[in-house]
Structures are given as structure tokens and as C-alpha cells.
Amino acid sequence: MPVSCLVVGSLRALEVRCSDAELFSSWRDVDVVIVPTAAAFTSLEAAAVACATPFSSRDARVESLMLKDRSTVDDAYFVRRLREADVVVLSDGSSLHARSVWRSSPVGEAIGAARCLVAVGATASVLGTTMIDPRGGAPTTGLGYRDGLVITTTTPPEQLARTRSLLDDDVVLAVVGEDGALDYDGVTWRASGDVVATRGPRVVTLD
């Protein structure tokens, strides 16, 4: 796969990235698995359908795993499908709920080992070793699926300032807006659209 991880601020941004012929030239006739765990407090079904839509024009085979809570985190079929999929998509929703379900579980390990991991919206914060608690902006423990950045979505300025003040000065924080995207090839993160990256108080460029 051309990327190891794709973070998008919204489904609209995912649509745009999926239409990028150069970046995703191999995203045809691929096996896509959607994990809508983060949408457990709204609708897993609606989230799954919404996440599948951007892949509909790419001749992808799409399956959704309705993983709502920890009762199925050791399900052998779920684990197998996550490991064999070309692309695993994590829906937007509650990052804290997603973390609590996936942490220290066979399903969580399979998500982390995905060939290409796509995270939509707030759920992207769980990807790194450090995530941002959406309730107040404090750094906390992430799942370590993809590292090198601390990722969060757009928040009120006061909360964002608090987040930056609590991170070490050598840590890069990427704030992904609704039209923003981050691509990771396993070595380097690259930003496009509405993304602001900072190290301490300074704005930095990702490349």
C-alpha cells in the first residue's frame, strides 16, 4: 500500500483523498474493513455506511465489523479479517470509548498491525503513544499504533493552548481540521489541507 496510515479530519476529507489517483493508485479492488467502534454512542450502522461511501467508486470490497464493546475483542473472525484486510478504517466518534475497547486486546493488536490504517476525525488521537483527552485537552496514554506525532482535532483556543503547555517542547502536535489530512509512509508524516503542526509554541512543517 502507498501509505501506512491516513488521518482525515472528516469523511469529506476522506472523499478527497480517495479521489487522489496518484496517492491511491492501487486502491482498486482492495479489501476494506471498517471498524465503527467509536460511534457506539450514536449509531455503528450509520457510521459504517458513511465510512464505506468514499470507497464505493474504487471497486473495493467493504465489510464492517460491528465491534461495540469488549465482549467481542477476542472474536477470531474479527481478528482474522483485520489482519488480512488491505485497508482498515476507524470511524469518527468517541476516542476514549475506542481506546477502552481496543486496548490490550487481540482486536486492538490486529488494528495496530493493519497494512494501511485510516482514522477519521477524533478517533485519530488514539493512534500515537500519547493521545489528547477531549474532555480537557490533557495528554494521556494512546495505543501506539502509529507514532511520531500527537494528533488531535480542532478544539477551542483555550483548550488547545492548555494542550500545548502540557506537552514537552520536543513533541510535535498536529491539529487536524475538518478538511485536513495526514499521510504516513512508515517513516515520515506529511500534512495537507487544514492541519497545523507545532513543536512547543512554534509552528513547524511536516515533511
Residue ranges and their predicted role:
Residues D31, C116-L117, V172:
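Proline-centered loop/turn at the N-terminus of a beta-strand
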Residues V32, V88, G121, L182:
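A residue-level signal for conserved active-site and pocket-lining positions in enzyme catalytic cores
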Residues A52, F78-V79, S104-I111, T163-R164:
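Short amphipathic alpha-helical segments and helix-helix/interface helices
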Residues M1-R28, A38-V49, G137-D207:
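C-terminal and late-domain segments of enzyme folds
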Residues D59, A85, A114, R146-D147, ...:
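Short, well-ordered alpha-helix to beta-strand connector turns
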Residues S91-E158:
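Class I SAM-dependent methyltransferase SAM-binding "motif I" and its flanking Rossmann-like core
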Residues V33-V35, A39-G93, H97:
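Portal/gating segments that form or line small-molecule/metal binding sites
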